[in-house]
Design a protein with these regions (language model features):
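A short, hydrophobic beta-strand/beta-hairpin element that forms part of a small beta-sheet core
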Residues: 27-31, 536, 569-582
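Non-catalytic, surface beta->alpha helical segment in thiol-disulfide oxidoreductase systems
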Residues: 573-601
Length: 601
């Protein structure tokens, strides 16, 4: 028997029937759920970013272990939530989240409820968000006919190879298929740090050469398309201009002819890439921007250069932070089958389509060193503009399979994002100042906009808006805002909205840590969403003739399913063991009391 008292008690599935059948009172059951976010919130699924309203039971979403290493959690349950209160949080770097008051976000002081946060707090942002946002695009880029044609050309037209691809769902793909993005990234890596080659017994293999710490990411993507890989460590000894060097690499190999045929069909280069020359595949060039980005992530992970920010002094002794990106370089055989001029145009197109500005690129004879085989080498050198927006766009592409490039570039991206947001804020203030010029004096404008008088004078003489003062050296900025794989983003503004019925989505995860990433911020789903709790407790103390109990929908899923509870909060009213009514969504105590008294008469 469940104990009686004046507060609303939480009960379980096992206690439910006894509670509603053996009570001589009217029974009100409050079904509640865990964390709640706006339906437009973006979650990281495997392997893409989608709105939370796409989540369903069994979905896999990005989570972490206790050391903040990536892992995936399964969704145990999901519910629609209606609340009469919504909290919007905006950060200094332009991130935004809308949630219920009790929702937990990770801050520099641990997990804190949304309604307890202030602009003194910073929220944890997860840096490694290189997952694609896939837009609807039903255009086919890979067909059975193309694969069969490639197999016949390679004298590999055996039915079992085609069947292997068919079993893995790789014979017919559209641009909006998740596998398309994984293949685009792997192909990018294959063209730079990989190979399609012949092995013993006439077996073909696909190999990727990466650092040891990048192996897991390659294997994860190969598994997603249905292939297991072998791993072998190797030390390469070389010599350039009488200077010997050694390099440790890890070979990730898939000895499956079907995968060899697949990548050959997609534009992979068989044999020595230096002799053949690089070429961007047509399906990438003609594909949507999201596919091009996925390709560049793998391609730049192989041959791209990382962006770094350094603190330097000018001739006047002024200190400032500057972005540095070494030119991206490629070597072509002077008699290569594929034209270096065409490759430069193709690659430049992909970069510029991603918002990256290129300085004047050059194609010239490589004079720095001679090849052992005496073949003449052509050097393509592509310098990248390092202004705020171009540098930010470059780092926003992301590097897959290259942690040594990915981490410094993503840290730089956070810094650039902050400076860009501050610059945009100053531009808006400049526009406001110009509009106020004829109505107020300069001091009033300065005080209203919180901008120095000298800056207002400069704006009125035609000067453009610049980043505000308050310079901090980049290394000090890193120490202030970055901890391991997490960058803390300071809260800029908190908006509390009330008086309407706001929709939310509740999701419960099955792993230990319960952490996840939404809108690039780190959240926790352990705190129950008890939005009706104060109202229910007040009514329980006031209406002694009614018994109030609470059910956690996620922990008692059979009961939620039995009563078809899909929207939270949901109050179900029982009389003599039978449901007589239900109240959906957040309601005031007066509304609920009036309805309950109707069943007491």
């Amino acid at each position: 028997m469940v104990a009686r008292n004046d507060s609303a008690m939480e009960i379980t599935d096992e206690e439910f029937d006894e509670t509603i059948n053996n009570s001589h009172k009217l029974v009100v059951v409050d079904f509640f759920a865990e964390w709640c976010l706006d339906p437009k919130t973006e979650l990281i699924f495997n392997p893409e970013i989608k709105n939370i309203n796409k989540v369903e039971k069994g979905s896999r979403v990005l989570s972490f272990d206790n050391n903040f290493n990536e892992s995936y959690a399964n969704v145990k349950s999901t519910h629609k939530i209606v609340s009469n209160k919504r909290i919007k949080i905006l950060t200094r770097r332009g991130r935004e989240i809308a949630c219920t008051p009790e929702h937990l976000l990770l801050t520099e002081n641990g997990f804190i409820k949304a309604d307890k946060l202030s602009t003194d707090n910073s929220i944890a942002a997860y840096l490694f968000s290189t997952y694609p946002k896939i837009k609807e695009n039903s255009k086919l880029f890979l067909t059975r006919d193309l694969i069969v044609k490639t197999a016949m050309k390679l004298n590999l037209d055996k039915e079992r190879y085609i069947e292997e691809l068919e079993q893995r769902g790789l014979l017919k793909l559209r641009y909006d298929n998740e596998k398309a993005h994984v293949l685009a990234s792997l192909l990018g890596l294959l063209l730079t740090d990989g190979s399609l080659s012949m092995q013993k017994n006439n077996l073909r293999s696909v190999e990727f050469f990466v650092n040891e710490k990048d192996v897991d990411e390659v294997i994860k993507d190969l598994k997603f398309i249905g292939y297991e890989a072998g791993v072998r460590k190797q030390e390469i000894v070389g010599k350039i201009n009488n200077r010997e060097f050694s390099q440790k690499i890890t070979r990730v190999r898939v000895s499956k002819t079907s995968l060899f045929i697949l990548f050959a069909s997609l534009g992979g280069i068989i044999g020595k890439k230096f002799i053949r020359g690089l070429k961007i595949p047509e399906w990438i060039l003609k594909g949507p921007a999201e596919i091009q980005k996925s390709f560049l992530q793998g391609f730049l992970g192989g041959d791209g250069t990382k962006l770094e920010i350094k603190t330097i002094k000018d001739k006047q002794g002024n200190t400032y932070n500057k972005s540095f990106i070494n030119p991206i370089e490629f070597h072509f055989y002077s008699e290569a089958e594929n034209s270096p001029d065409n490759f430069l145009k193709e690659f430049s197109y992909l970069l510029e389509n991603s918002g990256v500005k290129i300085r004047k690129a050059t194609i010239e004879k490589e004079e720095r060193y001679k090849r052992k085989d005496k073949k003449e080498s052509i050097l393509i050198k592509i310098p990248i503009h390092t202004n705020f927006k171009s540098a930010y766009s470059y780092t926003s592409i992301g590097f897959k399979y290259a942690l040594n490039k990915k981490l410094p570039s993503l840290l730089a991206r956070e810094y650039l994002k902050e400076r860009i947001e501050l610059l945009e804020e100053m531009k808006k203030k400049r526009e406001q100042a110009v509009l106020m010029k004829d109505k107020f004096d300069i001091k009033k404008i300065s005080d209203t906009l919180n901008v120095p008088i000298s800056t207002i004078y400069n704006w009125f003489t035609g000067k453009e808006a610049r980043n505000p003062r308050g310079f901090i050296e980049y290394n000090d900025w890193i120490k202030k805002y970055v901890k391991g794989k997490i960058a803390y983003d300071k809260i800029k503004k908190i908006v509390v909205e009330e008086g309407k019925q706001y929709p939310f989505i509740s999701v419960s995860l099955d792993n230990e840590t319960k952490m996840f990433v939404a809108n690039e911020l780190i959240h926790h789903n352990c705190m129950p969403c008890l939005m009706m709790n104060p109202v229910i407790e007040e009514l329980a103390n006031k209406m002694k003739e009614v018994k109030f109990v609470k059910i956690n929908s996620d922990e008692n899923q059979n009961l939620s399913s039995r009563y078809r509870v899909s929207t939270i909060p949901c109050l179900i009213i029982f009389k003599d063991g039978k449901e007589v009514d239900r109240i959906i969504g957040g309601q005031t105590g007066d509304v609920i009391e009036e309805k309950l008294r109707g069943y007491l008469e």
